């Protein structure tokens, strides 16, 4: 196995101290002879030898002027080629590739034969130049890093180093160090060696290749320092470090590089710890930006249809209008049949409250109630306009603060009854202050939704006595408003087939009402008399005083109602009410409910003249349980409707118009009878409509 190295461009300098002789291995196999060995020539310049070497060299016959004798690693030194002494410390070996290889081979063979004849022994011993032990260790570790031991630990063959052998004309150069000076040899050529070769062979022939050092100065310095130390310790350190072809020779060379300190400089724990100690806060996390506002934006819209339809063009009430309303209300109070002293006292007290600028509560209350009055639509406001001879009546359904503070609701109802009955009824006494407070709290707690039309009982009073009123007062609602303020709500648009009471509730009065014609009056005698009963839907049970006082107020109305001859109109109202109960909430809403609650605390004992009021027995109220959505709705029903239900349940007090309804009621509520059976799944039902609905499910699933 041959390892080739090119030394054409680099000079390898190595010491020759502690050189040993190399045993020549005779190879009897001619096939292993390597004829490609490049010969070397020895160029000696300024070589300094010790005294023993100088004496040996001076005894030779070779003169210095003969030039440089040839010398190669693959042949022993001839006797005639003596190394002269010079004044330099370096010995350079240079390759001479221009010489004839065949001539050198013949010369080497002749030298071998002469040497064998001179020694006369079986083992041919030659003395020649070789590399030092440290160099052998490096070469061995380069090619065989896993092998042990190193060549330095292998015992070498004994060599004979005679000073001068004149008989065989051989010279043995045993280089020694004199006074610390070293002799260096620099070979320069390509070397091909083989273990079993008849020429010069190193102890580790396979590992005889040299390495390249890119920094010769640093390498020479390390070699000089290391050669002064122990050879064995040096070889052990080299074998453990497994040095490669980078030119590093020992551990001290690695330590001189300070690789660990360089790594510590680049990756420092202090640098990592103190990295975020600056005040710039560049490495901290950026705070999140607030995208939405902290509070939602407030809009004017309530997201309801009623808000967008009712408030877009209502006129604003200025303080002058409020004062006018205050004066009108005071005049109407003084002109009523109520007690003059009580009315004057209330008007004066309220005017003082309204006129005092320091009373903030009263001012805020007036403004709030005025806004609520604008918010709710009142169709009874403009049924009659105030003239110089007549006073405008206060509307009980509107949220009027002046009306609430000047006149009690019971007095308002009494004034309306007196106006309808041509002031023939007596006024009632004023309520106590506690009743007034309870009425105000109930009024605000039961505020009606603005989108529903407000129709109170005063409308029916005006309808009954319309012929007795001034024709100038019969005007449509909102007739005095400007064109920009008049609008029609969607709930006011009715079809032509709508009932009369629905048209009155939405569009107001008109001259072509069928129940106000003369035909209606002619049919008054043929129409049976009936009574109207105001029912309160899903309200709390009234106290006995409440029911008696409410029936008393109703009796005032019916005491004079037959005298007007309007039974036909009332019958038509009742019949239309039965036909269209779900059309529009009729005849009173929250204000009427509040008035009834207020009436419960009032007691009408006598008239202004002291004459007692005749009490008549009327049918009691009948209450129905309704859904919470219609808790505040109030309707008018006649007693004739109650009499038209002859089929009474023997278990509960319910009555029905038809017997089928009674049977269905008994089957579904009071008994477990199931006469209607399904012919598909054998389920039984108490009602036929339930069976029909069940059969539809079978059709939907494809069972039929």
Swiss-Prot record:
Compositional bias segments (type: Low complexity): 141-166, 228-246, 593-608
Entry domain remark: The 9aaTAD motif (residues 261 to 269) is a transactivation domain present in a large number of yeast and animal transcription factors.
Biased composition (Basic and acidic residues): 91-112
Functional note: Positive transcriptional factor that acts as a component of the stress responsive system. Recognizes and binds to the stress response element (STRE) which is involved in the response to various forms of stress (heat, oxidative, osmotic, etc.). Involved in the regulation of the CTT1, DDR2, HSP12 genes. May be regulated via WHI2-PSR1 complex phosphatase activity.
A Pfam match: zf-C2H2
Upper lineage: Eukaryota, Fungi, Dikarya, Ascomycota, Saccharomycotina
A Gene Ontology cellular-component term: cytoplasm
Signal sequence segment: none
Keywords carried by this UniProt record: Activator, Cytoplasm, DNA-binding, Metal-binding, Nucleus, Phosphoprotein, Repeat, Transcription, Transcription regulation, Zinc, Zinc-finger
Single annotated GO MF: DNA-binding transcription factor activity, RNA polymerase II-specific
GO-annotated biological processes: cellular hypotonic response; cellular response to acidic pH; cellular response to alkaline pH; cellular response to amino acid starvation; cellular response to arsenic-containing substance; cellular response to caloric restriction; cellular response to cold; cellular response to ethanol
Quaternary structure, from the entry: Interacts with WHI2.
Native source organism of the sequence: Saccharomyces cerevisiae (strain ATCC 204508 / S288c)
Gene3D superfamilies found in the cross-reference section: Classic Zinc Finger
Regions of compositional bias (Polar residues) in chain numbering: 113-133, 167-193, 204-220, 426-437
Protein name: Zinc finger protein MSN2
Entry-linked PANTHER family: C2H2-TYPE DOMAIN-CONTAINING PROTEIN (PTHR16515:SF66), PR DOMAIN ZINC FINGER PROTEIN (PTHR16515)
InterPro entries membership: Zinc_finger, Znf_C2H2_sf, Znf_C2H2_type
């Amino acid at each position: 196995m041959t390892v080739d190295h090119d030394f054409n461009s680099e000079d390898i300098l190595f010491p020759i101290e502690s050189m040993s002789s190399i045993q020549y291995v005779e190879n009897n196999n001619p096939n292993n002879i390597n004829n490609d060995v490049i010969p070397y020539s020895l160029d000696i310049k300024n070589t300094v030898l010790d005294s023993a070497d100088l004496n040996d060299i001076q005894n030779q016959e070779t003169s210095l002027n003969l030039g440089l004798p040839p010398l190669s690693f693959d042949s022993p030194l001839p006797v005639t080629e003596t190394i002269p002494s010079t004044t330099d410390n370096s010995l350079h070996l240079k390759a001479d590739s221009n010489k004839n290889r065949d001539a050198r081979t013949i010369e080497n063979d002749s030298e071998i034969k002469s040497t064998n004849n001179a020694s006369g022994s079986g083992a041919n011993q030659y003395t020649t130049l070789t590399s030092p032990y440290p160099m052998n260790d490096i070469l061995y570790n380069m090619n065989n890093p896993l092998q042990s031991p190193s060549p330095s630990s292998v015992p070498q063959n004994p060599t004979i180093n005679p000073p001068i052998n004149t008989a065989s004309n051989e010279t043995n150069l045993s280089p020694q160090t004199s006074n610390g000076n070293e002799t260096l040899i620099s070979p320069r050529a390509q070397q091909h060696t083989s273990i079993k070769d008849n020429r010069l062979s190193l102890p580790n022939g396979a590992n005889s290749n040299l390495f390249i050092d890119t920094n010769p100065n640093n390498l020479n310095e390390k070699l000089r320092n290391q050669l002064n130390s122990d050879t064995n310790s040096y070889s052990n350190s080299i074998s453990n470090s497994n040095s490669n072809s980078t030119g590093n020779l020992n551990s001290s060379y690695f330590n001189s590089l300070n690789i660990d300190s360089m790594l510590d400089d680049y990756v420092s724990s202090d640098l990592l710890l103190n990295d975020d100690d600056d005040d710039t806060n560049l490495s901290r996390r950026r705070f999140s930006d607030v995208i939405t506002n902290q509070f939602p934006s407030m809009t004017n819209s309530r997201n309801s249809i009623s808000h967008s339809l009712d408030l877009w063009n209502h006129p604003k009430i200025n303080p002058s209008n409020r004062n006018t309303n205050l004066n009108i209300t005071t005049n109407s109070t003084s002109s009523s049949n109520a007690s003059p002293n009580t009315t004057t006292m209330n008007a004066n007290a309220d005017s003082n409250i309204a006129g005092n600028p320091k009373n903030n509560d009263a001012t805020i209350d007036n403004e709030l109630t005025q806004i609520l009055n604008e918010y709710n639509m009142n169709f009874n406001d403009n049924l009659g306009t105030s003239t110089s001879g007549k006073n405008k009546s206060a509307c009980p359904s509107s949220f009027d603060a002046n009306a609430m503070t000047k006149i009690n609701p019971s007095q308002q109802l009494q004034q309306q009854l007196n106006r309808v009955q041509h002031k023939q009824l007596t006024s009632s006494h004023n309520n106590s202050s506690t009743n007034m407070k309870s009425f105000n709290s109930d009024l605000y707690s039961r505020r009606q939704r603005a989108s529903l039309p407000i129709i109170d009982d005063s409308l029916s009073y005006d309808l009954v006595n319309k012929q007795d009123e001034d024709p100038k007062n019969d005007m449509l609602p909102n007739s005095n408003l400007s064109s920009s303020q008049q609008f029609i709500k969607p709930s006011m648009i009715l079809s032509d087939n709508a009932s009369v009471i629905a048209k009155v509730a939405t569009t107001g009065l008109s001259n072509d009402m069928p129940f106000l014609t003369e035909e209606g009056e002619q049919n008054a005698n043929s129409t049976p008399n009936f009574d109207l009963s105001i029912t309160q839907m899903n309200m709390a049970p009234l106290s006995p005083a409440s029911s008696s006082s409410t029936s008393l107020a109703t009796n005032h109305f019916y005491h004079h109602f037959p005298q007007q001859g309007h039974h036909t109109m009332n019958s038509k109202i009742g019949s239309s009410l039965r036909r269209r109960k779900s059309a529009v909430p009729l005849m009173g809403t929250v204000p009427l409910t509040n008035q009834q609650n207020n009436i419960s605390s009032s007691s009408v004992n006598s008239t202004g003249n002291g004459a007692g009021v005749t009490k008549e027995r009327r049918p009691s109220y009948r209450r129905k349980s309704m859904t919470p959505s219609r808790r505040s709705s109030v309707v008018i029903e006649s007693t004739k409707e109650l009499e038209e239900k002859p089929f009474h349940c023997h278990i509960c007090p319910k009555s029905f118009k038809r017997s089928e309804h009674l049977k269905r009621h008994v089957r579904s509520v009071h008994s477990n009878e199931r006469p209607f059976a399904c012919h598909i799944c054998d389920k039984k039902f108490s009602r036929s409509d339930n069976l029909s609905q069940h059969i539809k499910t079978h059709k939907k699933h494809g069972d039929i």
